[in-house]
């Protein structure tokens, strides 16, 4: 859902930089583990949950998505009716439904909780997919909301942020001590802050791999959920349509994680599994 690259990454990166500055100003260092852990958790989880709370606003602003309040045509009436039916079947509150301009076949879901979500589709999806295929895509996004993927991603990102902040400073302190020996006064030199910055980038790379692994895992679950809501054959047909029409996404990178676009990145950094793997998983499933 909410959830790269991922919707949180840009904000979380900024928070990591801010955390580095604040901790340096406050003199927090690896020898003060309790203080370090508290500060790391505040900044680590703070960035994720700020992103989560602002996710709908950020998504609307960055994509130009227009929420349907009063349907203007049959397509919008169908969208609202389909989402309402699927939301009821999934046991969640009715999400806001929006349409954004974009030639790609794509959709995303975001929001702070299961009962306060946003589901948006591109005009490219509406123009290039049949109603059955679009219904499956909507089911996929509703499944993201029903599965609680947004809050789970926020929690995971918070843990990863905290891990990066703490480990970078602990390892940075060890390396700095080894390089400089026992510095008089026990203070940290300029090299320490350079080392910490570099380590945050390196550990952040590994953290991204973990979050991308979770993102791929949740896509399989959302596909299964979409198949349950709309039908397995419709879900397979929607993914096959994507294979035929996979163009370059115009979604911002922080939103694309919640869409259903392909990726040219290496698999470890892909937010979505390859389409052929998703189709194979659906064919092997027992969902009707």
UniProtKB/Swiss-Prot annotation:
CDD domains, per database record: M48B_HtpX_like
Keyword set, alphabetical order: Cell inner membrane, Cell membrane, Hydrolase, Membrane, Metal-binding, Metalloprotease, Protease, Stress response, Transmembrane, Transmembrane helix, Zinc
Co-factor: note: Binds 1 zinc ion per subunit.
GO molecular function annotations of the record: metalloendopeptidase activity; zinc ion binding
GO cellular component entries: plasma membrane
Source species, domain of life: Bacteria
Transmembrane in keyword set: yes
Cofactor(s) of this protein: Zn(2+)
Membrane topology per record: Multi-pass membrane protein
Regions crossing the membrane: 5-25, 35-55, 155-175, 194-214
Subcellular location: Cell inner membrane
Catalytic residues identified in the record: 141
Enzyme class name: hydrolase
Example of a GO biological process term: proteolysis
EC number(s) stated in the UniProt entry for this protein: 3.4.24.-
Gene3D superfamilies, per database record: Metalloproteases ('zincins'), catalytic domain
Stated family: Belongs to the peptidase M48B family.
Name under which the protein is recorded: Protease HtpX
């Amino acid at each position: 859902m909410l959830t790269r690259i991922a919707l949180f990454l840009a904000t979380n990166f900024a928070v990591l930089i801010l955390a580095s500055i604040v901790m340096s100003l406050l003199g927090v260092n690896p020898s003060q583990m309790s203080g370090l852990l508290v500060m790391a958790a505040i900044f680590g989880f703070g960035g994720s949950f700020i992103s989560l709370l602002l996710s709908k606003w950020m998504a609307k602003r960055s994509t130009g998505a227009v929420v349907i309040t009063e349907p203007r045509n049959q397509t919008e009436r169908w969208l609202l009716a389909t989402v309402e039916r699927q939301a009821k079947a999934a046991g969640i509150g009715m999400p806001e439904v929006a349409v954004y301009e974009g030639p790609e076949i794509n959709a995303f879901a975001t929001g702070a909780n299961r009962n306060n979500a946003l589901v948006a589709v591109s005009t490219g999806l509406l123009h290039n997919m049949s109603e059955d295929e679009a219904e499956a895509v909507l089911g996929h996004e509703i499944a993201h909301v029903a599965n609680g993927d947004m809050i789970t991603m926020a929690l995971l990102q918070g843990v990863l942020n905290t891990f990066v902040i703490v480990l970078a400073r602990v390892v940075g302190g060890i390396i700095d001590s080894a390089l400089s020996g026992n510095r008089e006064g026990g203070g940290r030199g300029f090299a320490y802050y350079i080392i910490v910055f570099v380590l945050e980038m390196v550990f952040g790379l590994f953290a991204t791999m973990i979050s991308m692994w979770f993102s791929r895992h949740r896509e399989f679950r959302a596909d299964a959920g979409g198949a349950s809501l709309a039908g397995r054959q419709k879900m397979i047909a929607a993914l096959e349509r994507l294979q035929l029409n996979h163009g370059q996404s115009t979604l911002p990178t922080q939103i694309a994680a919640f869409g259903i676009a392909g990726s040219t990145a290496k698999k470890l950094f892909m937010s979505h599994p390859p389409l052929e793997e998703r189709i194979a998983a659906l064919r092997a499933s027992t969902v009707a």
